[in-house]
Amino acid sequence: MLPASPATIRRDITALEQAGKIRKARGRIFLEDIRKAPSYEMRDAMHDEEKKRIGKAAAALVREDDSIIIDAGTTTLALAENLRDRSHLSVITNSIPVAYTFNATNVNVFMCGGMLEDMALVDDDAVAFFASHQVEKAFIGASGVRGITGLTVVSPFQFAVKRQMVRSAREVYALLDESKFHIMGVNLFADFRELTGIITSKPITNERLLERLEQEHVKVIYTE
């Protein structure tokens, strides 16, 4: 063991805690599970320009008088920011940031109840809320893409809500920055056959995935 002063140890512990590798509680140090998804704040700062372009492209699909679902997430939030000036639009969401984006606008916002997890409301109440609605379009985020199968999410609580969102819309669009195609994910909540389209920023290079999307008639929309 290499010698280290108490000040050095405290400084290293603080750095590890700030990096999310450990947490302190009651005088003890615990390793964090590095497999869990990054926090909302961390995700919000990642791929920012990409998300803005995706949000703008998704907004072009929304018509006046549409009723839409906007999923929780930082990429879907970029869509909401592009819809603030719309009128006669109804938005159903489980996202606190999305709902707040439409504060003092002419957009009608309906928000579910539920347990708060990572700035999203989830649990059986949230699932039941979305089951009671049918909309024209749903705009969904994801933690990752599982091969040529479908979309995944880390949280089992968000899995159930996202699953119901997909069932509650006539058209379903996945908003995915390029990094999501390199993350396998845990809980599969949507098969590609259930999607109307994917909005992403860079060309998909996986030939097998492109073949599957073409087979299922899933539109791939690339941003400018």
Language-model region placement:
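HTH-adjacent hinge/linker in prokaryotic transcriptional regulators
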Residues: M1-I69, A80-H88, F102-V107
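Residues at secondary-structure transition points
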Residues: M42-E49, R53, T74, R86, ...
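Generic beta-structure capping elements
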Residues: E32-I34, G73, C112, A142-S143
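Short beta-strand scaffold positions
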Residues: I70-D71, T93, T200
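Conserved phosphate- and dinucleotide-binding cores of soluble alpha/beta proteins
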Residues: P3-S5, Q18, P97-E224
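Short, active-site-adjacent cap segments at secondary-structure transitions
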Residues: F30, T75-A78, A99, R146
